[in-house]
Amino acid sequence: MHQTVWIARHGNRLDFVNPDWFNTAKRPYDPPLSEDGFIQAQELGQRLKSEKISHIFCSPFLRTIQTADCVAEMLDLPLKLEAGLSEWLNPEWMRTKPETLSRKVLQEHFSRLDLGYTSRVVPEYPETMGQLGERTARIARTLVEEFTEDILLVGHGASVCGTTKGLVGGNPYINASLCCLVKLVGQSKNWHMELNGDVSHLSSTESQVRFN
């Protein structure tokens, strides 16, 4: 029986819209969604609400949780925080290990968090590009083996590319723009990509794709 894996990137982030936010932020490497990012997340939810998704996994960074939460509300599903979907822990992007909100704080703001779920893969800072590729491929393969229903992964530009390549193999170009959708259909080690960074559900898209 074939499985569908949906892979989405978070919506627009506040520091992309207001770069000065970084200078005074308490957690500068964990920006929230921008105002238009929330609109994108809602549009993503509208796009996916008729799909037969059984599980939603998201990176523990705030922007991915906020994006996934919009989808989870429309699909009436819990959120599983999976560190294997985290941002690339690139020391050129982050001078120190990024601080994210604790589960206790997140629970106060996101009632759909599945507190019984623990991450299957946990990255370490700093992380090379090779380690990123291995980590994201491993979490994608781990999740499709453990959860055989249709699933949604919500991550970052780097983890959208890495999880996709981890399943389809090779080195395909992935259009990992903000709030894009990748759709993979297959089983075991035989996957094909039906959508590559689709943004047809968005009312507004970025003019140039950036990861950081």
What are these regions (language model features)?
Residues 1-2, 80, 87-102, 149, ...:
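Acidic, low-complexity terminal tails and accessory targeting/binding regions
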Residues 2-81:
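Active-site-proximal alpha-helix that buttresses catalytic centers in soluble enzyme cores
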Residues 5, 147-157:
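Generic beta-sheet signal
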Residues 14, 64-65, 87-89, 159-161:
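Short, active-site-adjacent cap segments at secondary-structure transitions
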Residues 31-32, 75-134, 194-196, 206, ...:
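Phosphate-handling substructures
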Residues 40-44, 64-67, 128, 132-143:
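Alpha-helical packing segments of well-folded alpha/beta enzyme cores
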Residues 50-52, 143-149:
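Glycine-rich phosphate-binding loop signature in dinucleotide/nucleotide-binding domains
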Residues 58-61, 82-85, 154-158, 197:
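Short, well-ordered beta-to-alpha junction loops that form the rim of enzyme active sites
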